[in-house]
Amino acid sequence: MIFRIRHLILLCFFLFFLGFLILPLDNEWVQSPYGQSIYPNIAAVNHFLWSKVPFSIGDLGYAIGILLIFIRLKRFKFKRHIGLVLTTVFVIISLFYVCWGMHYFKTPLRVSRKLPATISVEHLKETTQHYAHALTALHQQISSDPATAIVTPLETDALLALATSTMEHSSLRPSKIHGKAKATLFPNLLSYMGFGGYLNPFTHEAQVNTLQPKLRVLTTACHEIAHQWGIAAEDEANYISIKATTASEVAVVRYAGHLLAFQHLINSLYRADAQQAKAVLDKLPEGILENIREVRAFWEKYQNPFEVVFERSYDQYLKANQQQAGIKSYSLVVDLLVDDYINR
C-alpha cells in the first residue's frame, strides 16, 4: 500500500513538473493571483514562523539534509531507492516554485519600462558622475577627513536591524509583505563560494554573509529582503536595494547605497570607455576609493579554484530561470539607474 501511495505521489509531482516545463506561464497570472494573493499569504506564514527565531532555520535545514544524504548513501541501492529519490527531487522542485520561484516568470522591469536595448556612453558617464558627486557630498557630511574611509561602529545584529528597518519603511515595500535579514550560519562557506547572501526559497529567510565590509552588509541585506518581497531578478533586487538605501534618513545607509550604485556604474563605464572612467575616479576623495578597495580586497582574499565552479553553476541556474544574462544579471541594474537619471 505504501509502495502504491509513493508511486501516486511521484506521478502527481512528475505531472506537475512536466506541465510546468511545457506550458508557458502567464505573466499576468504570476503578477496578479500569485503575486498579489497567494505569495503574500505564503510569505506571511513564513514570517510568522521564522522571523523571531534568532538564527537561520533554513541554513540548519540544509546542513541536516546534506548530513542525512551522506548517511543514506552508504545504504543506497539504485533499484530500491530510485523512486524515493525522484519523488524527493520532484517535491523539492515543485515546492521551490510554489513557495517563491514563480516570481522568475514576472514581466521584467526593463520590459515594463520599455528600456532601450543599449545605453549611450554619454548617458552612462552622466549618471556615473551624478552618483560620484552625491557620494562625495555624503562623504563630506559624514567625515571631516576626505582621506578616511567611511566606517560604522554598528555590530552585525544592529546592521541587519538597520537594513530591515530601511526596507520596512521604504515606500517601495509591498503593503502585505514584511522582510527581515538574518546572518547566515556559514559565512566562510558563502565567502569562498563568492556569495554575499541568498534567499532561502522555502523559509523565505534573507541570509547575509556578515564577513563582508559593513557597508556592503547593509546593501546586501536590503537586496535579500527585496527577494523576500517577491523580486526574483537580480538586477531588480539590486535596484530596489539602491533605491531604498539612497532614500534613507540615515546618512551612512545613503552612503552605502550610493557606493553600491557607483561601483556598478563605474565598472560599466570602465568597460565602455576606460579613460572617462579613470577621469571620474581621479576626482573622488581618497576615502571613497578606500571603501571601494575594501570590498575588492575582501573578495580577493577568498578567491579559490572552486569559486569558478560555483559561479558557473549559479550562472546556469539563473539562465534556467528566465535570467538570460546569467550571473551578469546583477550588473544590469546600470540600465535601470541610467533610465532613472535621464528621465528624472
List each language-model region with its residue ranges:
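Pan-zinc metallopeptidase signature
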Residues: 288-344
